[in-house]
């Protein structure tokens, strides 16, 4: 009953998001998800409950893109799953289905152009479903709801908890111990945190490689020394690797389990991200006959200090944009009133 008391007028998630209003049976309202299911020969109205206990979550906890760059109210999101659920398969969808008009990227999809490296970029949303589906639990048929909405009893009735949160919030880890009954809560918590710690540390490594790659491309674009005959092609290769490397990093960063939904996939994706970012650096170095190499030596946090504070409001302040070397590539935004605070509308 938490939903009935905590959902505000501005919150778009309610009972009807997952339940038929008359029967309270699970049902899908997401047209993009239904489109995908139909494309693989499944009837959204005739799926088993075991599958529905994850698909209702996949209505939102997924990666998606809009099928029109206008992103207007008549446009609709598309789930990029036609080639599979891996980062590589999703990336292949973004190799077309867009309107980028830049040498080497014509017709590709991009969410924005990075102001520093001038690279058409991809922003992952929250690919929880795509990460979980071929992980240990997903492959074993464990549904999202089994862990995040475990059964409980209220007044003698069995029902699913609607406190949507991490199972780690429960000191007893009862959701986990429904299956892992032979393990203590302390042991299970330790295994989860071990995976998350390894993933997070690798995420930070991949992040630094990505920043260095953007900086390498920036330096190569502004390089005025002697350049090789294939300079333009090397710049395209560098940008392509920056774009893909950051997307792979973001696939793990934007996902909510810090690797736990699929430890092998998370670490493999981050390894690929690091390799791609290094490929970008190598291409940028070649494009300048290694003339920029001295400027890329050392701790990347010293070369490009971490941006610890940034917001739309701060970008409206020209003086603040003087506080970081990368901010020089941003245009000050026009003054505007703040409309939202988190998920609460304030005006």
Where are these predicted regions, by residue range?
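Primarily the internal scaffold of c-type cytochrome electron-transfer domains
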Residues: 2-146, 150-336
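Extended, compositionally biased alpha-helical segments that mediate assembly or anchoring
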Residues: 338-347
């Amino acid at each position: 009953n938490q939903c009935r008391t905590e959902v505000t007028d501005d919150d778009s998630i309610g009972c009807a998001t997952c339940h038929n209003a008359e029967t309270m049976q699970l049902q899908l309202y997401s047209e993009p998800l239904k489109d995908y299911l139909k494309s693989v020969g499944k009837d959204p109205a005739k799926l088993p409950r075991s599958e529905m206990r994850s698909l209702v979550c996949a209505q939102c906890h997924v990666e998606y893109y809009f099928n029109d760059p206008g992103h207007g109210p008549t446009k609709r999101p598309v789930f990029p799953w036609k080639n599979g659920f891996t980062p590589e398969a999703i990336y292949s969808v973004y190799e077309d289905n867009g309107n980028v008009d830049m040498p080497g990227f014509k017709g590709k999809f991009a969410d924005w152009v990075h102001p520093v490296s001038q690279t058409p970029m991809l922003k992952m949303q929250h690919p929880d479903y795509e990460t979980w589906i071929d992980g240990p639990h997903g492959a074993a048929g464990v549904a999202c709801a089994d862990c995040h909405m475990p059964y409980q009893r209220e007044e003698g009735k069995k029902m699913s908890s609607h406190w949507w949160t991490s199972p780690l919030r429960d000191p007893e880890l009862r959701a986990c111990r429904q299956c892992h009954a032979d393990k203590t809560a302390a042991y299970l918590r330790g295994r989860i945190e071990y995976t998350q710690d390894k993933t997070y540390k690798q995420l930070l490594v991949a992040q630094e490689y990505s920043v260095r790659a953007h900086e390498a491309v920036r330096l190569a674009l502004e390089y005025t020394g002697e350049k090789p005959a294939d300079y333009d092609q090397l710049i395209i290769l560098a940008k392509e690797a920056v774009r893909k490397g950051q997307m792979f990093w973001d696939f793990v960063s934007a996902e909510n389990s810090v690797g736990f939904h699929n430890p092998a996939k998370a670490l493999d994706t981050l390894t690929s991200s690091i390799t791609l970012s290094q490929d970008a650096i190598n291409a940028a170095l070649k494009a300048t006959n290694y003339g920029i190499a001295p400027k890329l030596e050392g701790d990347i946090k010293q070369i490009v200090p971490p941006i610890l504070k940034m917001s739309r409001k701060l970008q409206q302040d020209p003086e603040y944009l003087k506080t970081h070397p990368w901010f020089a590539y941003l245009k000050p935004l026009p003054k505007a009133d703040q409309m939202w605070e988190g998920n609460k509308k304030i005006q």
